[in-house]
């Protein structure tokens, strides 16, 4: 009896190209991050603009998408370069193959080679942090307070509903804020 040999599946991790857009929109829709609407393209392009993006191909189609952004982090009185992995999205057919982990590791490696002294992961499952050697905060209470003891001044006006027209002003406000130790 001849042994059964699984077919070889071709995989490759490479930089995102505009021609990957259709595959990436499919992945985002598949996992529920997008609705498959016409506006998805614009949202995706805004999300990836000026970011470092990788895809992992499975049999010639992009099935994993990793997006990372660079910036600086305040450490004591210094600014140090960092890179943050903002998202890892994996299609259903590419799951449990290690492709997302390999693409994430490559993104982190490329950031380090390009000068990032600190690497951060966005919110992932706790096991994902541990797999890559990231520390996390403790799970025990360090301090407590009684919320009833807070004395917050009453608003003198109604809150203003912000829209996409306010995006530039909101962004400028965030850029002007004072950064403390650990701030990004």
Q: What is the meaning of each model-derived region?
A:
Residues 136-153:
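Flexible glycine-/small-residue-enriched beta->alpha junction loops
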Residues 112-117, 123-141:
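Conserved active-site alpha-helix within GNAT-family acetyltransferase domains
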Residues 33-34, 119-121:
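Short, hydrophobic beta-strand segments that form beta-sheet elements in well-ordered domains
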Residues 4-6:
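Acidic, Ala/Val/Gly-enriched low-complexity intrinsically disordered segments
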Residues 8-70, 77-84, 150-184:
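Short amphipathic alpha-helix that is part of the acyltransferase structural core
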Residues 85-90, 95-113:
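Conserved acetyl-CoA-binding loop-helix of GNAT-fold acetyltransferases
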Residues 71-73, 93, 126:
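Short coil/turn motifs at secondary-structure junctions
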